[in-house]
Amino acid sequence: MAVSKEDILETISNMTVLEIVDLISAMEEKFGVSAAAAVAAAPVAAAGGEAAAEVKDEFDVVMTSFGANKVGVIKVIRAITGLGLKEAKDMVEGAPSTVKEGANKDEAEKIKKELEEAGASVELK
């Protein structure tokens, strides 16, 4: 009779931390692997993700400050997002805040231009 993954996980969940450390050491010895090697590989994977992020199709429009024309910026936020007056006011006063997530480049540039014309400071991320 084979031992199922569920049985193994149940057994491990009932172990103490010291028992788990001993188990990991025994597995490293038995299979000739090192848990440290897997951890060291993780930053390499993250660095590869950053290279892929350079060619972006989607942008987040982030308002960093509303400038001197708070009322005008609130009006633009309401028009862009469809939020109510209170929600738009809270978004503007809570700057920096994300106005739009996952916008394509043209849409993000348009939103940025509208907000900057109203007096806000905007970043595309």
UniProtKB/Swiss-Prot annotation:
Keywords assigned by UniProt, alphabetized: Ribonucleoprotein, Ribosomal protein
GO terms classed as biological process: translation
InterPro entries in UniProt: Ribosomal_bL12, Ribosomal_bL12_C, Ribosomal_bL12_C/ClpS-like, Ribosomal_bL12_oligo, Ribosomal_bL12_oligo_N_sf
CDD domains linked: Ribosomal_L7_L12
Molecular function terms, GO-annotated: mRNA binding; structural constituent of ribosome
UniProt keyword annotation of Membrane present: no
GO cellular component: cytosolic large ribosomal subunit
SUPFAM superfamilies, per the entry: ClpS-like, Ribosomal protein L7/12, oligomerisation (N-terminal) domain
The keyword Transport appears for this protein: no
Function: Forms part of the ribosomal stalk which helps the ribosome interact with GTP-bound translation factors. Is thus essential for accurate translation.
HAMAP family: Ribosomal_bL12
Assigned protein family: Belongs to the bacterial ribosomal protein bL12 family.
Subunit structure: Homodimer. Part of the ribosomal stalk of the 50S ribosomal subunit. Forms a multimeric L10(L12)X complex, where L10 forms an elongated spine to which 2 to 4 L12 dimers bind in a sequential fashion. Binds GTP-bound translation factors.
Protein name in the entry: Large ribosomal subunit protein bL12
Species: Thioalkalivibrio sulfidiphilus (strain HL-EbGR7)
Lineage summary: Bacteria, Pseudomonadati, Pseudomonadota, Gammaproteobacteria, Chromatiales
